[in-house]
């Protein structure tokens, strides 16, 4: 009634059905049967004058005519000290793996803020550790592709391993300013001095001496562990890790070559040196990163003070995790070896490619990350909540298909002429897939459905109302006869008849449904409508009374789908 009144007295089926499903989600499973009733009701309402429609609404539901305030999408808070056209953000992943949900947060926030202030965003690969966090050659492109899938467009791109000469020049300047020195103490000796707040004996040598030692490092005079470059900080700082932190170390790249520059370099900047210098040289104005980097911010500010630079505005936010999926890089690597898992897009992983493969769309991640924003409190998202958001986004587009498991044959009797069955592909459209059901045809239902239709009327979706009569023993199958009672959807509703999905064997396709469960993958074998073969790879569909799934691969005799959620 309200839909008709708001649209010049004429209601439309599509928005009415969508509204019903939104308010009564459980009706989704029976929408094929409800749609005829809704269509009849709409025809009755549309025959009323618009004045009569308003009168009925005012009498029965006056609150529906009240104007409600519009709720706006949650927006990001402003950045401190930000001006239009002058904001420069950066997303700086380590290409030792691909991006997961937690990484997507700084990536999207950096992009959104750059857009908000009409500034620019930099993508910078921080790959200056060829040993402990060795880059994966394929990770660079995978990260680029993941960012593109998220809808992120960056203005500039840098790879730090290709910028080592630039970083070396900055390191020389830092030494000249008295802000760094070459330390030749053993790690054990330095730790003892650091813990007691005492300086290394090399610390107060003149910058010229340290520049000479730096040249000796470049010439290969020192081996791994014999010398490091340190930044001078506060030796009484309460956090011992801040005290004269390591800025660069020697790594024997003949043993662990870098995937891009090979064994060309032996002195490698640490994260804090490379990030701090590049943030300044690239003009970064705002850094958005997790609060685990607070100590890194403290360390880097010492370097900035030595050089007389202004440190960027830094926003630290809490960690973002997702229940039921694996986000830890180290755990992923371990499982790849132990369980022979796929490296990046295994659907058990919380990587963007893993989530995408199981049917999570980017709009879902947008909404989650915009909701948590830059809050400093850790956010743990349940998969149930993620699924609810994802469902609200994919439900309006995902086509529906019947699918059964543990097939049980029914021989349909009780009618003389063929029945044209209409299986709805989506409740908001008139698109259907039509079947011709002839007397004596065999359809297959799930064994679990058979257990609930004994001794009662049931409705075969899109066909009509039936009742079981007797077992059938054939040389080809053992099943049951089902006699047609009526075609009426209203009668099915009146008697609360269970609605049963079915397939015809000659018009079906085998479906392997993969269901991620923590560290396991469960498999269900279905028989689905053969029309499913018309869907493209990557499409998300809904199997009636099973849930949403993404088409992962297609073969002539089988389609593999990854289960997303109900």
UniProtKB/Swiss-Prot annotation:
EC number: 6.1.1.17
Location relative to the cell: Cytoplasm
Annotated GO CC locations: cytosol
Keywords attached to this entry: Aminoacyl-tRNA synthetase, ATP-binding, Cytoplasm, Ligase, Nucleotide-binding, Protein biosynthesis
UniProt xrefs under SUPFAM superfamilies: Nucleotidylyl transferase, Ribosomal protein L25-like
Signal peptide boundaries: none
One Pfam family in the UniProt entry: tRNA-synt_1c_C2
Catalytic activity: tRNA(Glu) + L-glutamate + ATP = L-glutamyl-tRNA(Glu) + AMP + diphosphate
Uppermost EC category: ligase
Claim: Cytoplasm is one of the keywords in the record: yes
Molecular functions (GO terms): ATP binding; glutamate-tRNA ligase activity
Motif ('HIGH' region) on chain: 93-103
Main location: cytoplasm
Domain of life (superkingdom): Archaea
Family: Belongs to the class-I aminoacyl-tRNA synthetase family. Glutamate--tRNA ligase type 2 subfamily.
NCBIfam families to which the protein is assigned, alphabetical: gltX_arch, PRK04156.1
Entry function: Catalyzes the attachment of glutamate to tRNA(Glu) in a two-step reaction: glutamate is first activated by ATP to form Glu-AMP and then transferred to the acceptor end of tRNA(Glu).
Protein name as catalogued: Glutamate--tRNA ligase
Species this protein is from: Staphylothermus marinus (strain ATCC 43588 / DSM 3639 / JCM 9404 / F1)
Name of the gene: gltX
